[in-house]
Amino acid sequence: MEARLSTGEKTKKMATTSRPSSPLPPEEETAAETTTSEEEEQQQMERFYALVANVRALRAMFKEAALPSCREDDVSGGGGGEQRQKRPRAAPWRPAFEMAVFECGGGGGTTTDDIEAATTKGQDGNCKKGKRSEANAAAEEDKGEVIEGKPVAIAIVADGPGKSTTMPDSN
């Protein structure tokens, strides 16, 4: 805080920057104005740099005072000037594909014929040995039981006069 000026220094600088009491010729007056404006600008620059130096000194002082004790006790993490430690980024999820999933089915979903063939041969439709698929397990549990399907809602759509088409509802 050494950059602050005492009141005595301020009055001295004001006295030096004030205009002389005797009138000057126009050429000398403009020259005197430019020198006073340059002096004022120089003083403003000096005050600005002194202010910046004071701010830096205060920041350093508070940073040194807060190092050992406050940072350990500071749970909220605010105001200490320290940065939060960043967590390491987790690797993005990558799907794991197995070729057996794509090779065996030949496309589409499983039909009842496929399930029956898999249960009679003892093979699973997913080609994984030692594991039973849900479809294969369900087919083994049924063993010829008749299961009724869910009721399906049908919507009738008219395509024009005298034409209608039935479409099953996708519920």
Curated annotation (Swiss-Prot):
One of its GO terms (cellular component) is nucleus. It is found in: Nucleus. Residues 26-43 have a biased composition (Acidic residues). Residues 1-45, 65-94, 119-143 are annotated as: Disordered. GO terms for biological process: defense response; regulation of systemic acquired resistance. Keywords: Nucleus, Plant defense. Residues 1-12 have a biased composition (Basic and acidic residues). Pfam families: NPR1_interact. Belongs to the NPR1-interactor family. Binds to and weakly represses NPR1/NH1-mediated transcriptional activation of LG2 in vitro. Interacts with NPR1/NH1. Interacts with NPR3/NH3. This is NRR repressor homolog 2.
